[in-house]
Amino acid sequence: MDQFTAMMIAEGSYSADEDEQITAWQTLINTGLAWQLQGWFGRTAQALIEDGVCKSANELSA
């Protein structure tokens, strides 16, 4: 998924099912964009990682 689409899904501007939402957030985490956008992106990404919904970029590269 490209970064723009991921951001639009995360913001709720594009409709998406649960799997697409998880993929969008994982894309934002993998690219680091989650930490560069508004604060709630990073906070939400961190919560998804802590809840086991998404993996940290470090976990994926290990």
Name the predicted role of every residue range:
Residues M1-A62:
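Catalytic phosphate/metal-binding cores of nucleic-acid and nucleotide-processing enzymes, i.e., regions
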